[in-house]
UniProtKB/Swiss-Prot annotation:
Keywords, sorted A to Z: Bacterial flagellum biogenesis, Cell wall biogenesis/degradation, Glycosidase, Hydrolase, Periplasm
Gene3D superfamilies to which the protein is assigned, alphabetical: 1.10.530.10, peptidoglycan hydrolase
Native organism: Escherichia coli (strain K12)
Main location: periplasm
Family recorded in the similarity comment: In the N-terminal section; belongs to the FlgJ family. In the C-terminal section; belongs to the glycosyl hydrolase 73 family.
Annotated EC: 3.2.1.-
Any Pfam family matching the protein: Glucosaminidase
Protein name as catalogued: Peptidoglycan hydrolase FlgJ
Note: Probably exported via the flagellum-specific export pathway.
Compartmental location: Periplasm
Active site residues according to the UniProt entry: 220, 245
A Gene Ontology biological process term: bacterial-type flagellum-dependent cell motility
Region (Catalytic): 148-313
GO molecular function annotations of the record: amidase activity; hydrolase activity, acting on glycosyl bonds
Phylogenetic lineage: Bacteria, Pseudomonadati, Pseudomonadota, Gammaproteobacteria, Enterobacterales
Length: 313
């Protein structure tokens, strides 16, 4: 019988292991029930991940023919690693149903199915994107990027695409505004105790806000002149909560209707300024510059990835 360790240590797209399993299963079906069940469980997880990917926009920041190929292969490997060991419990249930009269080895003692929420899938995706960007962006261009900008983009790329799909706000605009308002995550608003507020979009705490707030000194413009003023800002428990509130703010307020229906991220940036999101008279231009920088990053990642695809595995 093929050992599980040998089977699961191989790459998810290793046809040799699958052919070996097929041959052995034909010779001794009973002895190979568990490896086959593991493969079925892996296929189930792959289908789950594929369904999640199909629900996302296909024109993301890092989306290209090559990155979609990489993501597909990556998902296959994730599915195989998720089903290693006790896995999700699906394989053991199939083994029990197929061999009801035979006691299971100690290894297969039933366990509660492992919880695997969407946030964990997102975390795997963020790690993959971060590694991809770290390896693919050329060194001379990499030096011009501030701080942990690549990690910042990787962390927000998938949530921004989901938010864009739900709200209509261009995802490049979401990323650009978060980067501009927070200094690529390095100058985000802090609470009084120094902890992060997760307020990536500089949303102020108006009278209808019932959540926690923090007061800081910020720059506002009056008649084109910059002034330092005290202002209260909303505090969130996570970046995802901040993103959700930001999307709600734009979609529920009629004055931002032109933002949610903008044909491009650049048009959305101008619509934000026209709607009075910020007092900075150059807000739209700053956002547009940030959007162009992100699109340039996307192009460089795609081109470099296509030339060095073998080095990324």
């Amino acid at each position: 019988m093929i050992s599980d360790s040998k089977l699961l240590a191989s790459a998810a797209w290793d046809a040799q292991s699958l052919n070996e399993l097929k041959a052995k299963a034909g010779e001794d079906p009973a002895a190979n029930i568990r490896p086959v069940a593991r493969q079925v469980e892996g296929m189930f997880v792959q289908m789950m991940l594929k369904s999640m990917r199909d629900a996302l926009p296909k024109d993301g920041l890092f989306s290209s023919e090559h990155t979609r190929l990489y993501t597909s292969m990556y998902d296959q490997q994730i599915a195989q690693q998720m089903t290693a060991g006790k896995g999700l419990g699906l394989a053991e249930m199939m083994v029990k149903q197929m061999t009801p009269e035979q006691p299971l080895p100690e290894e297969s003692t039933p366990a509660a199915p492992m919880k695997f929420p969407l946030e964990t899938v997102v975390r795997y995706q963020n790690q993959a994107l971060s590694q991809l960007v770290q390896k693919a962006v050329p060194r001379n261009y990499d030096d011009s990027l501030p701080g942990d900008s690549k990690a910042f983009l990787a962390q927000l790329s998938l949530p921004a695409q989901l938010a864009s799909q739900q709200s209509g706000v261009p995802h490049h605009l979401i990323l650009a505004q978060a980067a501009l308002e927070s200094g690529w995550g390095q100058r985000q608003i802090r609470r009084e105790n120094g902890e992060p507020s997760y307020n990536l979009f500089g949303v102020k705490a108006s009278g209808n806000w019932k959540g926690p707030v923090t007061e800081i000194t910020t720059t506002e413009y009056e008649n084109g002149e910059a002034k330092k003023v005290k202002a209260k800002f909303r505090v969130y428990s996570s970046y995802l909560e901040a993103l959700s509130d930001y999307v709600g703010l734009l979609t529920r307020n009629p004055r931002y209707a032109a933002v949610t229906t903008a044909a491009s991220a650049e048009q959305g940036a101008q619509a934000l300024q026209d709607a009075g999101y910020a007092t900075d008279p150059h807000y739209a231009r700053k956002l547009t510059n940030m959007i162009q920088q992100m699109k340039s990053i996307s192009d460089k990642v795609s081109k470099t990835y296509s030339m060095n695809i073998d080095n990324l595995f």
